[in-house]
């Protein structure tokens, strides 16, 4: 068998807790469930930063955000940082991105040979936070309670329009690969189809909304009596600390979220169907994941931007050739996917120049053991004036922010993280070990100074660009109408045969 193809189907803001594959009692995710049933489900997979752009840059690069200065949603993803798309292209793969990756900066491809849609979010420095004025909201930043209060049903939104385009463009690219293969191009392919749902706004099409009733929707399982200092800052930042929500509003937003999870799941089904139609399903490893989760009212919090389980954990499912059927309990994270993809593609770590922070998950995916049981997270964006560090090791998760008391949870026995063990005498040794690790790995003050410096630089650059000192970086997919479909310089029969798949091959195939 030839080297397997790789297809990543990526959601935005999808907490695994709200999927059938991970045990939600009413979530309707049949396509994700089917992949989990025949493949490997990773039960302790984390993002490396609970915010869209930095999480995706860690995913693409296999490096923690502090290593590549990818701190927030307006950090440049530098062209000098190798990505898994670069490595796979070097290994002979065709590479394609359809959908969102939130690239910031002039490089809008980062190793993808083809990019078949624009992004849904801006590619400039406008969303740069200011740690010297942490109480000020970013201009045009929409993460507040308005999106919860305005949740509900609509036939169309900018997100629905986008994801429908992403799905179509991804399937068309796969069909073009099949056409090329029929002409003799045997190169394996690697595609990322990256959708915006179920990211807020929590607005769903009637088709998906009607899959659920209000009785299907659980209210948040845990709201603490008092909030830790970091949570208080996030609550202030998203306006949840002073904008009251009714039970009906919370239930409606959670219902719309579940509806959009089902909508995303339908996109997984469409991708699987197309892979089947082009004869590649048996030689394709499909990976389902997300950039981060969504608190969805748990602990009074919404969206992401923290390291509690609903925000920091992500689904991670692999299915395909030589992937075992089962569940992997080891802690892992999105930085592990770059070495995993290199492993799948037949490469080795010898290809890697700058150090990476991940390890290949292929042994776990094959049902083998892995001595590593650790995931690392860093949050360096809005609603905090200092870096926030997370270490998940075994059943324990430690959260550190310089001005705040530490947090330590046993997320296996206490999945709601209701009991902070940081000052529990029975866990004094573990808490001290985690604190020592943080001190050894990170210089908080130096990292903070570096972050503030780049924030200042980016605000200056953005002001200059807004004044006309540069062109916008938003990606425009190339398109030449003179070469599409049938044109007068083409032989109609040749064009018709080019687009037909499977090709005629001299016979009229009715199957």
Regions found by a protein language model. Name each.
Residues 412:
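Residues forming the ATP-binding cleft of Hanks-type serine/threonine protein kinase domains
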């Amino acid at each position: 068998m030839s080297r397997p193809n790789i297809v990543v189907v990526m959601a935005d803001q999808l907490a695994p807790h709200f999927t059938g594959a991970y045990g939600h009692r009413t979530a309707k995710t049949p396509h994700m469930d089917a992949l989990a049933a025949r493949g490997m489900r990773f039960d302790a997979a984390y993002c490396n930063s609970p915010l869209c752009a930095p999480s995706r840059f860690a995913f693409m690069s296999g490096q923690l955000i502090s290593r590549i200065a990818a701190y927030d949603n307006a950090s440049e993803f530098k062209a000098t940082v190798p990505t898994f798309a670069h490595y796979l292209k070097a290994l002979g793969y065709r590479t394609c991105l359809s959908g969102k990756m939130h690239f910031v900066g002039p490089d809008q491809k980062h190793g993808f040979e083809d990019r078949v849609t624009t992004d849904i979010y801006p590619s400039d420095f406008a969303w740069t936070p200011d740690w010297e004025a942490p109480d000020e909201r970013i201009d045009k930043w929409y993460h507040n309670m308005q999106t919860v209060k305005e949740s509900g049903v609509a036939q169309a939104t900018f997100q629905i329009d986008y994801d429908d385009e992403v799905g179509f463009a991804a399937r068309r690219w796969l069909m073009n690969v099949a056409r090329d293969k029929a002409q003799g191009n045997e190169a394996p392919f690697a595609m990322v189809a990256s959708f915006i749902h179920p990211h807020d706004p929590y607005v769903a099409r009637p088709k998906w909304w009607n899959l659920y009733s209000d009785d299907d929707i659980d209210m948040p399982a845990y709201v603490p009596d008092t909030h830790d200092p970091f949570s208080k800052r996030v609550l202030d930042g998203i306006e949840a600390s002073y904008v009251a929500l009714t039970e009906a509003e919370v239930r409606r937003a959670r219902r719309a979220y579940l509806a959009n999870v089902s909508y995303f799941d339908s996109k997984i089904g469409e991708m699987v169907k197309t892979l089947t139609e082009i004869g590649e399903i048996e030689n394709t490893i499909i990976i389902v994941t997300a950039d981060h989760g969504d608190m969805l009212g748990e602990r009074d919090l919404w969206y992401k931007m923290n390291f509690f389980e609903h925000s920091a954990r992500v689904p991670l499912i692999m299915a395909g050739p030589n992937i075992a059927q089962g569940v992997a309990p080891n802690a892992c994270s999105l930085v592990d996917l770059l070495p995993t993809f290199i492993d799948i593609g037949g490469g080795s770590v010898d290809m890697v120049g700058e150090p990476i922070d991940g390890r290949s998950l292929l042994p776990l995916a094959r049902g083998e053991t892995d001595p590593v049981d650790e995931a690392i997270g860093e949050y360096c964006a809005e609603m905090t004036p200092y870096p926030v560090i997370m270490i998940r090791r075994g059943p324990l998760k430690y959260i550190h922010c310089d001005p705040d008391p530490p947090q330590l949870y046993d997320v296996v026995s206490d999945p709601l993280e209701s009991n902070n063990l940081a000052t529990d005498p029975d866990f004094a040794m573990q808490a001290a070990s985690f604190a020592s690790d943080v001190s050894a790995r990170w210089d908080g003050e130096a990292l903070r100074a570096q972050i503030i410096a780049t924030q200042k630089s980016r605000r200056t650059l953005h002001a200059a660009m807004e004044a006309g000192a540069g062109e916008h970086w938003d990606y425009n997919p190339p398109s030449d109408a003179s070469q599409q479909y049938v044109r007068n310089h083409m032989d109609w029969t040749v064009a018709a045969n080019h687009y037909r798949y499977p090709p005629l091959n001299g016979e009229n195939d009715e199957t």
